[in-house]
Amino acid sequence: MPCLHSYRSAVEQAGGTVLEVQYCDAQPDRAAAAMEAVMQKYPQGVDALLVTSDDMALAAIKCIWDNNSAAYQKTVICGFDGNQAAVEALDRGELTVDIAQQGYEMGYKAVEAALDALEGKSVESVIDSGSEVITADNIDAYIADCREKGLWS
C-alpha cells in the first residue's frame, strides 16, 4: 500500500514511531471498534491518529468522546476526504487536520479526459486532481470554496 509506506516513512523521518495499523475497510463501525482496542492497549493515549477516511475519523472521535477519555483529548487526529461533516468537526476543534481529496476536481478532470478520449485526443495516464490540507488556519476559505461550487449548503 503506497499510502501506508509513505505514512510510515514520513513518521519515521520526523522521529516518530508507528505503533500499529488497524485495517477497517472504510467502515465506521470497524473504526470505532479499532479505536476502542487502541484506547485499551494504550490507556495513556497516543500522539496522533491518521485515519484514511473522514467517516472513520469521525467514528474514532465519537469513541473518544463517548468514553470521556482525557488521555485522548489532545491526540492529533487527521482524516481524509474533506467531507462536510469532518470539516465541521475540524471547525469545532474535534478533528485536527483533514486532507481533502478534491472530489469536485477529480470528477471535472475525469469528464474532460473522457471527452478528449471520445474526440480521439491523447489522454494523460496520470491526471493529478490535487489535494488540500485543511486546518484551523484555512478552514474558512475551504468552506467558502465548497459553497461557491455548490457542494455544500
Residue ranges and their predicted role:
Residues M1-C3:
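Glycine- and acidic-residue-enriched helix-capping/strand-helix junction motifs
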Residues A59, D81-A85, G93-E94, E105-K109, ...:
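Short amphipathic alpha-helical segments
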